[in-house]
């Protein structure tokens, strides 16, 4: 059992895409709210456990005006509000934090993932694995029927 830990909450915006990143909290029970009057679509949050035993979560959404989006988190009967991160317009890949509610955060850097996974390849792999599973199941069934026939006839 761990001590209760208050989460750190960040909003990351890129065009119409918004991500609410919630880091290092315990216990797992949490409610993440992305608030905007111009919502296009919103996804359920994904929660993972870190090696330290604390939890991290992210909630994604698409909004007409990403600047109108705020993120608030309810954890342990307390509400935590976000710190905004906006992409700089210069040539570096660093992210510049925008200070809100007297919260100061050090500069963070975001790096794009090196491996790009295409949806078509993932779907094809899933179908291939499903096909192999079906072939295996048929093989086991035929083997069972032939074995049963041998013993009972």
Curated annotation (Swiss-Prot):
InterPro entries: Ig-like_CS_Receptor, Ig-like_dom_sf, Ig-like_fold, Ig_C1-set. Its main location: membrane. It holds the Pfam family C1-set. Disulfide bonds join 20-71. CDD domains: IgC_TCR_delta. Residues 85-112 are annotated as: Disordered. It comes from the Eukaryota. Residues 85-102 have a biased composition (Basic and acidic residues). It is found in: Cell membrane. Glycans are attached at residues 14, 77. Gamma-delta TR is a heterodimer composed of a gamma and delta chain; disulfide-linked. The gamma-delta TR is associated with the transmembrane signaling CD3 coreceptor proteins following the stoichiometry: a single gamma-delta TR heterodimer associates with one CD3D-CD3E heterodimer, one CD3G-CD3E heterodimer and one CD247 homodimer forming a stable octameric structure. Upon activation, gamma-delta TR complex associates with FCER1G to initiate intracellular signaling. This is T cell receptor delta constant. It comes from Homo sapiens. The lineage of its organism: Eukaryota, Metazoa, Chordata, Craniata, Vertebrata. The gene is TRDC.
């Amino acid at each position: 059992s761990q001590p209760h830990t208050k989460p750190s909450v960040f909003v990351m915006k890129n065009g119409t895409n918004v991500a609410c990143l919630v880091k290092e909290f315990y216990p797992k029970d949490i409610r993440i709210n992305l608030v905007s009057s111009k919502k296009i679509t919103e996804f359920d949050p994904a929660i993972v456990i870190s090696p330290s035993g604390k939890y991290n979560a992210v909630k994604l959404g698409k909004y007409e005006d990403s600047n109108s989006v705020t993120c608030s988190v309810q954890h342990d009967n307390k509400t935590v509000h976000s710190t905004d991160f906006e992409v700089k317009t210069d040539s570096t890949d660093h992210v510049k934090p925008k200070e809100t509610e007297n919260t100061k955060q050090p500069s963070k850097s975001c790096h794009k993932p090196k491996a790009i996974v295409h949806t078509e390849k993932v779907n094809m792999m899933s179908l291939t694995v499903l096909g192999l599973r079906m072939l295996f199941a048929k093989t086991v069934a035929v083997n069972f029927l032939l074995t049963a026939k041998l013993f009972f006839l």
